[in-house]
């Protein structure tokens, strides 16, 4: 194969290409002329239609002039502004946006394969939102379960500690009368402490751990803490549930909806433990709309709290007393 090349009008030069063994042996592919169609799954084309930067389908495709790699217009322009002025795929130098060219033919090809691009993107967003919500729900359930386990361990350790203290006090009592008086005085001081511990344990909340570590009364910088006494509604709840008083200490930025969601998940976990169920379906279905939160007002009346109110706002607007705020809960009528 010979080709004549003109060089600046001086004299024509001839250049010969020699075919390789592969080129000599290969046979050309036959053109399809009978209208045959080959079905190709769009999923198999995903790697060809995907932007290497955002890993999503190409949008407003731009092609590099040097290496012919394709990227989304926004992705490659952002990469050139903040990166090393090189192709993210092969690291060839790209001086500026002048090294790129739009590729409308490739965009037209994608629109042929995915005619409803907006519907596809909306479906992707719904799937991602569902996955994110499921993961957040699992993380919340796992956090509450871990809290219950730590609480049980703390109860066991406190029980052993009180047994050891009571045992040592009894031994000292047999040694001398002075030690006997000291042990009696110590037991009298320990009595209210044991009673308070029992009350906190019955509430089912992990508050004593923070108190033992010396951090129970220390609030975060710039964030106030609210102490709550959380009881079932005296008239809207059944009598057997009336003893479920809970003591909570949380951030003042938390809202009433956060409190309702915590209550729904906590009660679902307790019900699951009580019935021995292994499936977390009830926990995942827990919602802040399952319970309504009330605050007592004058003359034994109860006011329904708006879910968007923060606990700090509720305290300033309704409570105004320097003691733990009392709230009441009951199932929402439409969720009964």
Curated annotation (Swiss-Prot):
Alphabetized, the UniProt keywords read:
Chromosome, Cytoplasm, Metal-binding, Nucleus, Repressor, Transcription, Transcription regulation, Transferase, Ubl conjugation pathway, Zinc, Zinc-finger
Q: Where are the zinc fingers (RING-type)?
A: 51-91
Segments of this protein annotated with the region Interaction with HIP2: 2-179
Instruction: List, alphabetically, the Pfam families matched.
Output: RAWUL, zf-C3HC4_2
- The EC number(s) this enzyme carries: 2.3.2.27
* Comp. bias regions, Polar residues: 176-190
InterPro entries linked: RAWUL, RING1/RING2, RING2_RAWUL_dom, Znf_RING, Znf_RING/FYVE/PHD, Znf_RING_CS
Where is this protein chiefly located?
A: nucleus
Q: Where in the cell is it found?
A: Nucleus; Cytoplasm; Chromosome
Mind telling me which GO cellular component terms the entry cites? chromosome; cytoplasm; MLL1 complex; nucleus; PcG protein complex; PRC1 complex; ubiquitin ligase complex
Q: Which residues cross the membrane?
A: none
| Biochemical pathway | Protein modification; protein ubiquitination
Record flagged with keyword Metal-binding: yes
Q: What class of enzyme is it?
A: transferase
Q: Where is this region: Disordered?
A: 158-218
**Is the keyword Transcription regulation in the record?**
yes
**One term of GO molecular function:** histone H2AK119 ubiquitin ligase activity
- Known function: E3 ubiquitin-protein ligase that mediates monoubiquitination of 'Lys-119' of histone H2A (H2AK119Ub), thereby playing a central role in histone code and gene regulation. H2AK119Ub gives a specific tag for epigenetic transcriptional repression. Essential component of a Polycomb group (PcG) multiprotein PRC1-like complex, a complex class required to maintain the transcriptionally repressive state of many genes, including Hox genes, throughout development. PcG PRC1 complex acts via chromatin remodeling and modification of histones, rendering chromatin heritably changed in its expressibility.
> What does the subunit section of this Swiss-Prot or TrEMBL entry state?
Component of chromatin-associated Polycomb (PcG) complexes. Component of a PRC1-like complex. Component of some MLL1/MLL complex.
Name of this chain's protein: E3 ubiquitin-protein ligase RING2
């Amino acid at each position: 194969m010979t080709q004549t090349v003109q060089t600046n009008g001086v004299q024509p030069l001839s250049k010969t290409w020699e075919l390789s063994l592969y080129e000599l042996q290969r046979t050309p592919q036959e053109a399809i002329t009978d209208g045959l169609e080959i079905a190709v799954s769009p999923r198999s084309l995903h790697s060809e239609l995907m932007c290497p930067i955002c890993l999503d389908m190409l949008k407003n495709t731009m092609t590099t002039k040097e290496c012919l790699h394709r990227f989304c217009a926004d992705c490659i322009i952002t990469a050139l502004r903040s990166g090393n002025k090189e192709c993210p795929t092969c690291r060839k130098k790209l001086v500026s946006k002048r090294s790129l060219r739009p590729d409308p033919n490739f965009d037209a090809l994608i629109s042929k394969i995915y005619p409803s691009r907006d519907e596809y993107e909306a479906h992707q967003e719904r799937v991602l939102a569902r996955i994110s919500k499921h993961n957040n729900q699992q993380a919340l359930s796992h956090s509450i379960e871990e809290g219950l386990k730590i609480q049980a361990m703390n109860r066991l350790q406190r029980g052993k500690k009180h047994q050891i203290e009571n045992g040592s006090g009894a031994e000292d009592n047999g040694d001398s009368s002075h030690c006997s008086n000291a042990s009696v005085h110590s037991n009298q001081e320990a009595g209210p402490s044991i009673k308070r511990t029992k009350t906190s344990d019955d509430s089912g909340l992990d508050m004593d751990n923070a108190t033992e570590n010396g951090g129970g009364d220390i609030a975060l910088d710039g964030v106030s803490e609210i102490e709550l006494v959380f009881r079932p509604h005296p008239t809207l709840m059944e009598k057997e549930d009336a003893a479920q008083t809970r003591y909570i200490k949380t951030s003042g930025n938390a809202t009433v909806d956060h409190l309702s969601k915590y209550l729904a998940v906590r009660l679902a976990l307790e019900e699951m433990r009580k019935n021995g169920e292994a499936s977390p379906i009830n926990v995942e279905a827990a919602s802040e709309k399952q319970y309504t939160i009330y605050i007592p007002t004058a003359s034994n009346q109860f006011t329904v709290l708006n879910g968007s109110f923060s606990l700090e706002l509720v305290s300033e607007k309704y409570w105004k007393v320097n003691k733990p705020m009392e709230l009441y809960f009951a199932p929402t009528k439409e969720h009964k």
